Amino acid sequence: MKSIVFMGTPQFAVPILKALIDSEDYQVLAVVSQPDRRVGRKRELRATPVKELALENGIEVLTPEKINHSPEMDRVIELAPDLIITAAFGQFLPDKLLAAAKVAAINVHGSLLPKYRGGAPIQYAVMNGDAETGVTIMYMVKKMDAGDIISQASLPITKQDDTGTMFEKLSLLGRDLLLDTLPKLLAGDITPVKQDESQVVFSPNITREQETIDFTLPADRIDDLVRGLRPAPVGNMVIDGLRTKVYDVTPLTETTDLQPGQVVRVEKHALIIAAGAGTTYQINSLKPAGKPKMDITDYLNGHQNLKPGVQAINND
């Protein structure tokens, strides 16, 4: 039985950790996760999903604010596991910590590296309208997501997917890929592949500016951005003078000569908006500032000024 220290934080890492806990081939000695954070309107202190799973299974949990030069790092080194496995941990790991693994320190990353190194690979894949994405297991090195590739698996992104659904799918794909890869890695049957630095694409964390959707883009690009920013932080536009979160849109085949942001037509249950390149889309659900999330029917009841030709969406 090989010993593991697992390092992860969000829900993405939970199925991966659970599979290792449930396996008879591995013993999880300890779990390292981010500290408890205050969340929600009530600012309640909440443990990470990974920490909760570890505690449910009686596993030692370490939660350093910063892992480098910490007592928690010393504890991992003391444990001297066969493997250190990370999945969306959220901190850089120093060389001294990586060297504590007797066999290897590896990472489960939510993209097909070298595309989308960084903290938001799944969001960027959806936002950019990629046809597929996947999971990479690679050796950990000091440079971000730059280690040699051990194994990869891919899956398609459909137009019904958003970042939430892809997180779930890639988490399960990562779990299955890891369980398939570890025996080969431990047996020495893996030939790692260096990443092609000329093909590197970065996916830094989403900024506040990126949450504002450019309404002059073609409808299919607007749809990609809406889905890529859902379920959080949710993209926004200024609609009828109010900053409004846009949860769901549908690109249409209908074309128009109207300018982006203008109302094409209003139906009982539909608001059709002009987008870039003569394309159109339908807004399905949204949340104006200071109001609850609502479907378009309820929204239109309070915005009867929106008529064909009206400039419904502006920059501010």
UniProtKB/Swiss-Prot annotation:
Listed InterPro entries: Fmt, Formyl_trans_C, Formyl_trans_C_sf, Formyl_transf_N, Formyl_transf_N_sf, Formyl_transferase-like_C_sf, GART_AS, Met-tRNA-FMT_C
GO terms for MF: methionyl-tRNA formyltransferase activity
Family: Belongs to the Fmt family.
Catalytic activity: L-methionyl-tRNA(fMet) + (6R)-10-formyltetrahydrofolate = N-formyl-L-methionyl-tRNA(fMet) + (6S)-5,6,7,8-tetrahydrofolate + H(+)
HAMAP family: Formyl_trans (MF_00182)
EC number: 2.1.2.9
Amino-acid positions noted as binding (6S)-5,6,7,8-tetrahydrofolate in the UniProt annotation, renumbered to this chain: 111-114
Keywords: Protein biosynthesis, Transferase
Function summary: Attaches a formyl group to the free amino group of methionyl-tRNA(fMet). The formyl group appears to play a dual role in the initiator identity of N-formylmethionyl-tRNA by promoting its recognition by IF2 and preventing the misappropriation of this tRNA by the elongation apparatus.
Keyword Transferase: yes
UniProt-recorded name of the protein: Methionyl-tRNA formyltransferase
Gene: fmt
Pfam families: Formyl_trans_C (PF02911), Formyl_trans_N (PF00551)
GO cellular component labels: cytosol
The protein's enzyme class: transferase
